[in-house]
Amino acid sequence: MNLKVKTISNIGGEVKAPPSKSYSHRAVILASLADGTSKIHDMLFSQDVLSSINVCRALGANITKKDDYLEVIGTNGKLHNSSEVPIDLGNSGTTLRLMTSIASLADNEVILTGDDSLQTRPMEILTESLASLGVCAASINGNGKAPILIKPGYVGGETNILGNVSSQFISSILISAPLSENGVDLFVLPEFKSRPYVNMTCDIMAKFGVKIENEFFVRHDDCDRESKNCRIDEFKISKQEYKSCDYVVEGDYSSASYLLAAVAIYGGNAKILNLFKDSKQGDKLILNILKKMGAKIEIFDDYVEISSEGNLKGIDVDLSNAPDLLITVAILAALADGTTNITGVKHARVKETDRIATTCSELKKLGCKLKEFEDGMSIEGGIRSGVVDSHKDHRLAMAFSLVGLKHDIEIKNGEVFDVSFPNFIEAMSEIGVELELI
């Protein structure tokens, strides 16, 4: 189906940001590993998160959706694969990466697979790092990608992993580490990208009762301790158990970026609820980006207010710790005056699509002048109406719909927003943007 803007009324009002996808994944997974019954409130039930729920059920967790929370009766780390066929994770790269380590805790073999897109995601860096911990996880097709066969056994010990490919590899090892036989000492080699996502993992692990020691050192005595290229992070996780708890999922700054950007682009005033001032989410960076581009932002304990005249200016921005903002910022840049330089997002090339390449190719269809680089792009403001393709990437579909605030736009395969933001159309309507699928 194609997504387009139907009508626009005065932009503004009040809308609640959807629950965090990242925290929802982690909450159901940790609750499934915990001893006892957990209640997860404000859970996001998107396609990706449902993939995590389904695999946790297959491995032994008892998960029930109640009226206003998700009840999870945990396994206390004692997993058993009840599925007689490969477990299909759909398009959820987060689920695949997080569960590859965890599946080794089962007492029988597990095969994790997914759709065609998921089967293009590189997994070799994770499986090689796990091998040093006594985990046998291998690509069935021998290409380093899903389907992944994971055999029982997780000894633990010491390993290292590159920090510049996917923070989910790091989170995967961290989450599974307390349930290994001997604990884990993990070294993250520079450059450590998307660090806030790992901070989120450590944060929620603490909520479920697990302690992590984190320190860092530099490669050589004469290295600059502030240099990202010299710093090696060490995470020490002893053998422990997860404890059940009641957990409330906070709002998602990634998804809220589309609501905030809509107000910034068109002009207006809005209050976005459920966005927490002390959040560890890296995508909170969107607030600083919009400020620099010309919007007025006020941050309160649990909501954000934005006002804008609709006149934005180009900026320079490093998205190394917030790669999921790439497409939103690219659209803001295309609708702003001047030039915007986006850097630090080489790791966005291994998302649902090569997001640097697909964003650039679709912007060019709209007459945008830009230059593509290995780790980002330079965009000159100026864009026209047209038709683009989402490449079945949920973030591309939602971000490009923002073009419709200024120009006619139609996005092919636009229905894929269900992956992360099921009520995207309804939320946009609450601030005055009527979208339709045709």
UniProtKB/Swiss-Prot annotation:
- Cross-referenced PROSITE patterns: EPSP_SYNTHASE_1 (PS00104), EPSP_SYNTHASE_2 (PS00885)
What does the entry list as the binding residues for phosphoenolpyruvate?
K21, G93, R121, Q168, R355, R395
Positions annotated as active site in the UniProt record: D324 (proton acceptor)
Task: Report which residue ranges the record marks as coiled coil.
Answer: none
Q: Name one GO molecular function term.
A: 3-phosphoshikimate 1-carboxyvinyltransferase activity
Keyword annotations for this protein? Amino-acid biosynthesis, Aromatic amino acid biosynthesis, Cytoplasm, Transferase
Q: Give the primary localization class.
A: cytoplasm
Q: What is its EC number?
A: 2.5.1.19
Q: Which GO terms describe its biological process?
A: amino acid biosynthetic process; aromatic amino acid family biosynthetic process; chorismate biosynthetic process
Superkingdom of the organism of origin: Archaea
- Gene3D superfamilies according to UniProt: Enolpyruvate transferase domain (3.65.10.10)
Compartments annotated for it: namely: Cytoplasm
Q: Catalyses which reaction?
A: 3-phosphoshikimate + phosphoenolpyruvate = 5-O-(1-carboxyvinyl)-3-phosphoshikimate + phosphate
GO CC, sorted alphabetically, is: cytoplasm
Kindly tell me the pathway this chain contributes to. Metabolic intermediate biosynthesis; chorismate biosynthesis
What does the entry list as the binding residues for 3-phosphoshikimate? K21, S22, R26, S166, S167, Q168, S194, D324, K351
Family of this protein: Belongs to the EPSP synthase family.
What does this gene product do?
A: Catalyzes the transfer of the enolpyruvyl moiety of phosphoenolpyruvate (PEP) to the 5-hydroxyl of shikimate-3-phosphate (S3P) to produce enolpyruvyl shikimate-3-phosphate and inorganic phosphate.
Task: Describe, as the record does, how this protein assembles with itself and its partners.
Answer: Monomer.
For this protein, the record's NCBIfam families field holds: aroA
PANTHER family attached to this UniProt entry: AROM/DEHYDROQUINATE SYNTHASE, PENTAFUNCTIONAL AROM POLYPEPTIDE
User: Could you identify this protein by its name?
Assistant: 3-phosphoshikimate 1-carboxyvinyltransferase
Native source species: Methanobrevibacter smithii (strain ATCC 35061 / DSM 861 / OCM 144 / PS)
